[in-house]
């Protein structure tokens, strides 16, 4: 089976991209164990704890990221530079366990995958 990478690069509540990406990620986990999840750019906001999407009349799907370990999805990486550029500390207690990597190391990991889906 091919190795599939999911890249989350958009903010969580400005569009449905994050929610749709998470749905696709969970569905794909039924087909393969070779899944990697990458959070880059505004996608780092997907993992912030204590979000209140109801304040902007958005659906709260962020807690669903906590289910990734139940689906045996444990290869998750976050771009440390993206976090810093947005005023976030890479050591933040994110909603899932992620490994913070420099852009070059993140790119090297991404090249290990056969299929890349971006949300």
Curated annotation (Swiss-Prot):
One of its GO terms (cellular component) is cytoplasm. SUPFAM superfamilies: DsrEFH-like (SSF75169). GO terms for biological process: tRNA processing. InterPro entries: DsrEFH-like (IPR027396), Sulphur_relay_DsrE/F-like (IPR003787), Sulphur_relay_TusC (IPR037450), Sulphur_relay_TusC/DsrF (IPR017462). It comes from the Bacteria. It is found in: Cytoplasm. Keywords: Cytoplasm, tRNA processing. Belongs to the DsrF/TusC family. Part of a sulfur-relay system required for 2-thiolation of 5-methylaminomethyl-2-thiouridine (mnm(5)s(2)U) at tRNA wobble positions. NCBIfam families: PRK00211.1, sulf_tusC_dsrF. Heterohexamer, formed by a dimer of trimers. The hexameric TusBCD complex contains 2 copies each of TusB, TusC and TusD. The TusBCD complex interacts with TusE. This is Protein TusC. It comes from Klebsiella pneumoniae (strain 342). The gene is tusC.
């Amino acid at each position: 089976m091919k190795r599939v990478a999911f890249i989350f690069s958009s903010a969580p509540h400005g569009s449905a991209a994050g929610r749709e990406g998470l749905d696709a990620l969970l569905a794909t986990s039924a087909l393969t164990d070779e899944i990697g999840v990458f959070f880059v750019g505004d996608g780092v906001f997907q993992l912030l704890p204590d979000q209140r999407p109801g304040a902007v009349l958005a659906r709260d799907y962020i807690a669903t990221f906590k289910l990734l370990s139940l689906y045996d999805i444990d290869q998750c990486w976050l771009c440390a530079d993206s976090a810093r550029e947005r005023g976030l500390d890479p050591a933040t207690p994110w909603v899932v366990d992620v490994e913070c990597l420099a852009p070059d190391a993140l790119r090297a990991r991404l090249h290990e995958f056969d299929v890349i889906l971006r949300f």
